[in-house]
Amino acid sequence: MAKRGKKYVEAAKLVDRAAAYSATEAVELVKKTNTAKFDATVEAAFRLGVDPKKADQQIRGAVVLPHGTGKVQRVLVFAKGEKAKEAEAAGADFVGDADYIGKIQQGWFDFDVVVATPDMMGEVGKLGRVLGPKGLMPNPKTGTVTFDVTKAVNEIKAGKVEYRVDKAGNIHVPIGKVSFEDAKLVENFRTIADTLQKVKPAAAKGTYMKNVTVASTMGPGVRVDVSTLA
């Protein structure tokens, strides 16, 4: 395990590891314990009582955070004809078809989110091995395979984030930047928590939200009292 820096160690002393803080207190602590010299991302981590190995307990989707993430997302849209024009009008950063497939195969990744119209998926599917491991493959569950490219681009630009449970039952989601007002971070935090409650698999048994923490990019994790996220 990497040795922690002096600033991190000092910051960690401010956090009572045995305590579960309210969402508001946790956000305040995350700001106090942020050691980065840049506008660090604030990330929430949810440990869920699900078995991701079972198909009926997979959790994946997307939600628009009311105050965005503070990051400007570069959107690539695979579309043709009128749909390509719609994507450009909506503010997509890159719009095209086969030409971008070739660029990506050659190692171009100057984008953060990929959207594709359903008729393009036969071609985009060729990029599965490249985009899949990076979490960039378009998917109907996250609204990134759609003919409504205007809505897709608008939502992404407005602060839509994707969530997906990993093999250990965890979900990590950015909820903003340390420069955000506390109230905005808390509202974003509650929005994602509420969304995860709504998509709880019927097959999930026992406690669903087992543990929730929040932290800045280079700061210590702060445990959150789940009841304060309701």
Curated annotation (Swiss-Prot):
Protein's job: Binds directly to 23S rRNA. The L1 stalk is quite mobile in the ribosome, and is involved in E site tRNA release.
PANTHER family per record: 54S RIBOSOMAL PROTEIN L1, MITOCHONDRIAL (PTHR36427), LARGE RIBOSOMAL SUBUNIT PROTEIN UL1M (PTHR36427:SF3)
Annotated keywords: Repressor, Ribonucleoprotein, Ribosomal protein, RNA-binding, rRNA-binding, Translation regulation, tRNA-binding
Keyword ATP-binding listed: no
One of the record's GO molecular function terms: rRNA binding
InterPro entries listed in its UniProt record: Ribosom_uL1_bac-type, Ribosomal_uL1, Ribosomal_uL1-like, Ribosomal_uL1/biogenesis, Ribosomal_uL1_3-a/b-sand, Ribosomal_uL1_CS
Pfam families reported in the protein's UniProt record: Ribosomal_L1
Organism: Bacillus anthracis
GO biological process: regulation of translation; translation
Record family assignment: Belongs to the universal ribosomal protein uL1 family.
Protein name per Swiss-Prot or TrEMBL: Large ribosomal subunit protein uL1
Leader sequence residues: none
Lineage: Bacteria, Bacillati, Bacillota, Bacilli, Bacillales
Name of the gene encoding the protein in the UniProt record: rplA
Complex and partners: Part of the 50S ribosomal subunit.
